[in-house]
Amino acid sequence: MNFKIDKTDGNARACTLQTAHSTIQTPIFMPVGTLGAVKSLDAIDLKEILDAKIILANTYHLYLRPTSKVVREFGGLHGFSKFDRSFLTDSGGFQAFSLSKISKPDENGIKFKSHIDGSMHYFTPKSVLDTQYDLSSDIMMILDDLVALPATKERIDLSIKRTINWAKIACEYHKSNKQKSVGIDQNIFGIIQGGTDYNARKLCAEALCEMEFDGLAIGGLSVGESNEEMYDTVEALMPFIDKNRPRYLMGVGTPEDLVQNVERGVDMFDCVMPTRNARNGTLFTSFGKINIKSAAFIKDDNKIDPECDCYTCSNFSRGYLNHLYKARELTFFRLASLHNLHYYLNLVKQMREAIMQGKFKEFKREFYAKRGMI
C-alpha cells in the first residue's frame, strides 16, 4: 500500500492511499457489503452510480456462508461480486462477539456458535487471516478482543493484553506468508482497543505502532459509550497513532460523527447506518434527516434533498418514494440506499475539498448551521 498525506488543516487530513485495485482519497466512507454485496445494490450501482472506491465485507459471515473456500474458487471477492475496486474485510471478531449466543474468548482466540445452524467454530489470529487470504481483500483486519461498554478495568486490561498478543501473532504470520508469496497484494491493519480508558488506549496504540501494520484502526467505540466519550477518546488517542499510516474508526457513524472525527484526524469510516436507515425510510439531507413515510410527503413533488444531485434525487420525487415505501415496493430499497450512500460519499468528498483549501472550520460551521445546530 502506498500512502501519502496530501494536506492537513488543523488535525484534519486529506490523504491518498493506493491498493492493488483502486486509488482512495480520504477522508473516505466505506459502504458496508457484509455478505459481499451492499444490500439492494450491485457492482454497477457501486461503481457507475456511486463511484465507490472501496467497500467493506465481513469475514465472519462469508466464512460461514458460502465459506471462504467457495469465494476463493471465483477469484476472491472481486471475482465473486464483480466489484473490481478495493475491499476491506473485517476480521469477524465483532460478529462472533455480538451475534453468537455463545461467545467465549480465551488467550488464543474466540469460540463461538454459528447464528445460522448452531455449529461451533473457533477464530484465531492466524485463522482469520487464512480466511481473508481466500477472500483476497485489499485490506485485512486482525482479530481483536472487543469489550462492550461500560466495562470493568480488569476486563479492559485483559482485552488489550489479548489484542496486543494477537496483533503480534497476526503481524508475524502475515510477514511470513508474504515471503511465501501469499497475500502479497494484501494489507493488514491493527486494531486499537481499550474502551474509554486513556491509559489502556495509549498502551495498546503504542504497542501496535511498533508493529509492521499498513494501517491502524480504532475499535471498540460506538458500543455503548456517549458521543462525547467517543470524541474525547479519539482525540486523546491521536497523538499516539503513527501519522504516516491510515487511521480507521470502525463502525462509525452518523454524519455528525464523521465531521467530528475527521476534525480529530480520522481518515476512514464504515457504518451500516446509511443503508439500514434507507430501508427503514429515514433519508439523510443537507438539512438533517427526513422520514419519507410521513404523510407530509404524499403530494411532495420535490427531491429528497434540494442540494443533492444523486441518481435518486435527479429522477424521482419525495411523493414517489413515499408511495414506494408504503407499498413495500422493492425498488424503494435501491433508490433510498443510493441516495443515502451518495450523501455519505459526498459528505467526505466535501470535507476533503475543505481540507485541501484550508477551510475545514468554515465547512464545519456551515454543516451545523444548516441543521440548526449552531
Curated annotation (Swiss-Prot):
Specify the protein name. Queuine tRNA-ribosyltransferase
Task: Please give a single GO biological process term from the UniProt record.
Answer: queuosine biosynthetic process
Pathway field of the UniProt record reads:
tRNA modification; tRNA-queuosine biosynthesis
The lineage, from the top, is: Bacteria, Pseudomonadati, Campylobacterota, Epsilonproteobacteria, Campylobacterales
**What does this protein need as cofactor?**
Zn(2+)
Cofactor binding note of this UniProt entry: Binds 1 zinc ion per subunit.
- EC numbers, comma separated: 2.4.2.29
* One GO CC term on file: cytosol
What role does this protein play?
Catalyzes the base-exchange of a guanine (G) residue with the queuine precursor 7-aminomethyl-7-deazaguanine (PreQ1) at position 34 (anticodon wobble position) in tRNAs with GU(N) anticodons (tRNA-Asp, -Asn, -His and -Tyr). Catalysis occurs through a double-displacement mechanism. The nucleophile active site attacks the C1' of nucleotide 34 to detach the guanine base from the RNA, forming a covalent enzyme-RNA intermediate. The proton acceptor active site deprotonates the incoming PreQ1, allowing a nucleophilic attack on the C1' of the ribose to form the product.
Catalysed reaction(s) here are: 7-aminomethyl-7-carbaguanine + guanosine(34) in tRNA = 7-aminomethyl-7-carbaguanosine(34) in tRNA + guanine
